[in-house]
Swiss-Prot record:
<dbReference type="InterPro" id="IPR004150">
    <property type="entry name" value="NAD_DNA_ligase_OB"/>
</dbReference>
<dbReference type="InterPro" id="IPR010994">
    <property type="entry name" value="RuvA_2-like"/>
</dbReference>
<dbReference type="GO" id="GO:0006260">
    <property type="term" value="P:DNA replication"/>
</dbReference>
<dbReference type="InterPro" id="IPR018239">
    <property type="entry name" value="DNA_ligase_AS"/>
</dbReference>
<dbReference type="InterPro" id="IPR020923">
    <property type="entry name" value="DNA_ligase_B"/>
</dbReference>
<dbReference type="InterPro" id="IPR013840">
    <property type="entry name" value="DNAligase_N"/>
</dbReference>
<keyword id="KW-0436">Ligase</keyword>
<dbReference type="Pfam" id="PF03120">
    <property type="entry name" value="DNA_ligase_OB"/>
</dbReference>
<dbReference type="Pfam" id="PF01653">
    <property type="entry name" value="DNA_ligase_aden"/>
</dbReference>
<dbReference type="InterPro" id="IPR050326">
    <property type="entry name" value="NAD_dep_DNA_ligaseB"/>
</dbReference>
<dbReference type="GO" id="GO:0003911">
    <property type="term" value="F:DNA ligase (NAD+) activity"/>
</dbReference>
<keyword id="KW-0235">DNA replication</keyword>
<feature type="active site" description="N6-AMP-lysine intermediate">
    <location>
        <position position="125"/>
    </location>
</feature>
<dbReference type="InterPro" id="IPR013839">
    <property type="entry name" value="DNAligase_adenylation"/>
</dbReference>
<comment type="function">
    <text>Catalyzes the formation of phosphodiester linkages between 5'-phosphoryl and 3'-hydroxyl groups in double-stranded DNA using NAD as a coenzyme and as the energy source for the reaction.</text>
</comment>
<dbReference type="InterPro" id="IPR033136">
    <property type="entry name" value="DNA_ligase_CS"/>
</dbReference>
<protein>
    <recommendedName>
        <fullName>DNA ligase B</fullName>
        <ecNumber>6.5.1.2</ecNumber>
    </recommendedName>
</protein>
């Protein structure tokens, strides 16, 4: 099916600024869109941290936050106020600040970051909620939410109720500050297959609510930092394991290069784990003294996240296509995104009715994933632009019996019919894709779907864009088509029957087909009364009758007397 190009609407123009894609909005609209998205993120953020309820999927929130930063940079706006961190509700100071972790985009960035650094280790990036645990004289005395990295909420009463978190320690850990991730315990979680499950939001919800002490039994802890702990990583891991923090020891691996990091990353992505992850963290064994830790300044560690299962993509245009049956399909053109190494720049929305129900316009942000066989799929609309400029769909008078003949209003369905008759399901014309059909039709102005049979080799060779080899191949294919069976020619005419039903009917000529009754048709495999009626309508259609006579004049098998 070909896109209804003349009906495409609202294509957004983009330009590059500092390596980022920027919408070509007037300043007033850019300011409005940024303010609206900023407010929406702030509202979601507030609900998430105050009520423990996620109004949007974690991955969607993260991607829209990144989109906001991108837009702000496009217009030269300060990005420091972007609401990507929890609101400061608590006032309990962290004894050691949470630095956060720098994100690396790809393997090349990982290689560059590792260059010049030594004694490196890799851990899974456990997806949960960050916390500080303070042990004094062998007892857990405080537990503090990450907050803004310098201070957060006092979570001590809740943390004491989590069985997997040791309440007492000894030795070097008797007086220690630990930083880690509270996570939702899973059995055999395979990240690649099961995804993130909104685990971060679920953990936050459990910690925020006041009436769910039993739910805390499902939480675990992964310690990823022991500020001022043993400088030797194996010793650090051993002591953590003896104290009851065994997961850190099990899932911390020494690495020498990016290949080993990539191997661990792929293994944890595809293996059964006790927690949800969203990538890996590479860290140096040697860390600065804890008094030098500051939010956003942890240059001794970096993360390489997994690509999201679904990507937020911006709609650049809405287009319509008309198939050979006359069905109008809506397609959203996208600012390209990468999904599982596949470049996705359009997604099928399906019918006009479904498009209207989705209420999608250029400028909207939609969530796209890959369905079976890598086909892009629309999952949801996650953000709507203020401007709702939508195209008007083409008239809906097309059906399975229209556009066998070319006309101004029939261009798209006519092209779809040509593509169909050249496919393997019909005449099997190798090398004849949509572009080739469109070039031939634009140059030679076909009258009907079989006009190409009358072309000479010279006419084909003179078609703009056709090299000598291409035109010769097309000429051969057109000549070979004349020898195809009657059944295949009938399929090319889009008879509403399967090839299996036609074979069962045994018809080998147009004359035989005309003699068949409706009862004969509905007794064929996978047909029935309704389809049999459609066959009769098709057979009696004036355009079909005219085409059958034209094919007879061309001496196509089965159509002559």
């Amino acid at each position: 099916m070909r896109l209804w190009k003349s009906m495409a609407w609202g294509i957004l123009l983009w330009h590059s600024q500092s390596g980022a894609l920027c919408p070509a909005w007037p300043p007033a609209r850019a300011a409005e869109e940024i303010t609206r998205l900023q407010q929406q993120l702030a509202d979601w953020n507030d609900i998430y941290w105050k009520q423990g309820v996620s109004a949007v999927d974690d991955s969607v929130y993260d991607q829209l936050s990144a989109r906001l930063v991108q837009w702000q940079r496009c217009v030269g706006q300060d990005v420091s106020s972007t609401p990507v961190s929890p609101p400061l509700n608590g006032t309990t100071m962290h004894p050691v600040a949470h630095t956060g972790v720098r994100k690396l985009a790809d393997r090349q960035a990982v290689e560059q970051w590792m260059r010049g650094r030594s004694e490196l280790w890799v851990q899974p990036k456990v997806d949960g909620v960050a916390v500080t645990l303070v042990y004094q004289n062998g007892k857990l005395t405080r537990a503090i939410s990450r907050g803004n990295g310098l201070q957060g909420e006092d979570w001590t009463p809740k943390i004491r109720l989590i069985p997997s978190i040791p309440q007492t320690t000894q030795g070097a850990l008797a007086n220690a500050v630990l930083q880690g991730e509270i996570f939702l315990q899973r059995e055999g979680h395979i990240q690649q297959r099961m995804g993130g499950m909104n685990a971060r939001s679920k953990v936050a919800g459990m910690l925020m609510r006041q009436d769910n002490a039993s739910a805390l039994n499902s939480l675990g802890i992964f310690i990823w930092a022991w500020p001022d702990g043993p400088a030797n990583m194996p010793e650090r891991l051993s002591q953590l394991a003896k104290a009851g923090f065994s997961l850190t020891n099990k899932y911390t691996l020494a690495v020498k290069d990016a290949s080993e990091v990539e191997r661990a990353r792929q293994s944890w992505l595809t293996s059964a784990l006790p927690f949800v992850t969203d990538g890996v963290v590479i860290r140096m064994a040697k860390e600065p003294a804890s008094q030098h830790w500051r939010p956003g300044q942890g240059d001794w560690l970096a993360a390489w996240k997994y690509p999201p299962v679904a990507q937020v993509a911006q709609v650049s245009a809405i287009q319509f296509s008309v198939g050979k049956s006359g069905k109008i399909t809506v397609v959203a053109s996208l600012v390209p995104v990468i999904l599982d190494d596949k470049r996705v720049q359009r997604v099928n929305i399906d019918s006009v009715k479904r498009w209207e129900a989705w209420d999608i316009a250029p400028g909207d942000q939609i969530l796209v994933s890959l369905a079976g066989q890598g086909i892009p799929r629309l999952d949801e609309v996650v953000w709507r632009s203020r401007e709702r400029s939508k195209p008007v769909p083409p008239d809906s008078h097309f059906n399975s019996l229209t556009c066998f003949y070319a006309s101004e209003t029939c261009q798209e369905q006519f092209i779809s019919r040509l593509v169909w008759l050249g496919s393997r399901s019909a005449l099997g014309l190798d090398g004849m894709g949509e572009a080739s059909w469109r070039a031939l039709h634009q140059t030679h102005r076909f009258k009907h779907i079989f006009s190409w049979l009358a072309l000479t080799s010279a006419q084909i060779a003179n078609t703009p864009g056709f090299a000598k080899g291409k035109s010769e191949q097309i000429w051969r294919q057109f000549n070979l088509a004349r020898r195809q069976s009657f059944t295949r020619w009938i399929m090319a005419m889009d008879i509403p029957l399967t090839q299996a039903a036609l074979q069962a009917s045994g018809d080998r000529s147009w004359e035989q087909l005309l003699m068949r009754t409706e009862q004969h048709w509905w007794q064929l495999p996978a047909t029935g009364e309704r389809r049999a009626g459609r066959v009769i309508d098709w057979r009696n259609n004036p355009q079909i009758k005219t085409l059958s006579r034209w094919l007879a004049a061309q001496h196509i098998p089965g159509f002559g007397s």
